[in-house]
Amino acid sequence: MPTVNQLIRKPRVTPVKRNKVPALQSNPQKRGVCTRVYTTTPKKPNSALRKVAKVRLTSGFEVIGYIPGEGHNLQEHSVVMIRGGRVKDLPGVRYHIIRGLLDTQGVKNRKQRRSKYGAKRPK
């Protein structure tokens, strides 16, 4: 533990917090247009074809967004809303596309956690 004199000479420095979602510019969501919709493979222990889209945001950033859920209707020039939230096994994917909003349809036949996937309540 430093002495009072040592603290006067060299005060404590708080580490700088790095922004994990810079493209959102402190907004909860941002709108963008899909420039490319494709699949990619996850990191080492996992194996799948994960659906992702390259999105040009209204702020001018070009980011990669993950498309959650089973099946989607996105293609080039689709208008989407993006939120923060990385995908742990996909390097470079730090955003999620919001389902059931703008051009993105909700997940069909979804019974649980429907609000997360933009699915209406089944009759």
UniProtKB/Swiss-Prot annotation:
It holds the Pfam family Ribosom_S12_S23. InterPro entries: NA-bd_OB-fold, Ribosomal_uS12, Ribosomal_uS12_bac. One of its GO terms (biological process) is translation. CDD domains: Ribosomal_S12. GO terms for cellular component: small ribosomal subunit. Keywords: Methylation, Ribonucleoprotein, Ribosomal protein, RNA-binding, rRNA-binding, tRNA-binding. GO terms for molecular function: rRNA binding; structural constituent of ribosome; tRNA binding. The modification 3-methylthioaspartic acid is found at D89. Part of the 30S ribosomal subunit. Contacts proteins S8 and S17. May interact with IF1 in the 30S initiation complex. Belongs to the universal ribosomal protein uS12 family. With S4 and S5 plays an important role in translational accuracy. This is Small ribosomal subunit protein uS12. It comes from Bartonella quintana (strain Toulouse) (Rochalimaea quintana).
